[in-house]
């Protein structure tokens, strides 16, 4: 492929990505949460991913959602904006500062305390205490212990529940086999596990830093 054609192709993809991100509108509280996240360096979802999360929640009519990786609350605000009146978000983070900032922004946004619970602790330990087959959607953001969190998702999800892994492609690093840092390896292995497991029907979407969406089929494997 001629270099100028490749250059135009790359430029076109960047333009499409930028347009997709700008399509999503963030309200004042989402913008404030994002600004807070930038100050503390929390890995929050992009506007495009946040809007996608809201879309999935609305489409699935999910009333029980687990978010692993609260961050500054950006993701939680998007999720809650799509949940029905009787829905509850359980959001988990290992950093107390993240949990505090997220709680503050939820309160500022006048979200009823009955709509969410924020849990702080070692992620895999907290997840292990959640009830079996009780959630319609699980969202995973961190790469640490990703394999174990995917396995726990089997247990947490109701039949035909959805798993979403945010930042699944590490903004392209996962697709590059020369990238051998721990995060890229963990995410690459996580995608492989889901792809090769017949219990999941999955797709990878190039929005934000990459999103993997998987439907738990709850089938008996011979």
Predicted regions and their residues:
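A short alpha-helical cap/connector motif
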Residues: 1-137, 144-164, 168-222
């Amino acid at each position: 492929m001629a270099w100028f054609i490749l250059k135009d192709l790359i430029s076109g993809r960047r333009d499409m990505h930028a347009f997709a991100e700008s399509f999503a509108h963030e309200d004042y509280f989402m913008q404030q949460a994002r600004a807070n996240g930038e100050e503390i360096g929390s890995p929050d979802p992009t506007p495009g991913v946040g809007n996608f999360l809201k879309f999935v929640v609305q489409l699935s009519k999910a009333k029980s959602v687990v978010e692993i990786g609260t961050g500054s609350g950006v993701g939680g605000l998007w999720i809650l904006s799509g949940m029905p009146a009787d829905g509850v978000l359980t959001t988990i983070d290992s950093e107390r500062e993240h949990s505090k900032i997220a709680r503050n922004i939820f309160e500022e946004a006048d979200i009823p305390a009955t709509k969410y619970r924020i849990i702080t602790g070692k992620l895999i330990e907290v997840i292990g205490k959640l009830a079996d087959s009780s959630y319609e959607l699980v969202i995973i953001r961190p790469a640490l212990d990703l394999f174990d969190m995917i396995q726990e998702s089997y247990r947490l999800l109701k039949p035909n529940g959805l798993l979403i892994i945010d930042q699944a492609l590490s903004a392209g690093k996962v697709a590059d086999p020369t990238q051998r840092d721990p995060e890229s390896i963990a995410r690459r292995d996580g995608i492989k596990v889901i792809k090769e497991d017949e219990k999941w029907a999955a797709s990878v979407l190039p929005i934000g830093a990459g999103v993997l969406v998987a439907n738990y089929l709850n089938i008996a494997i011979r």
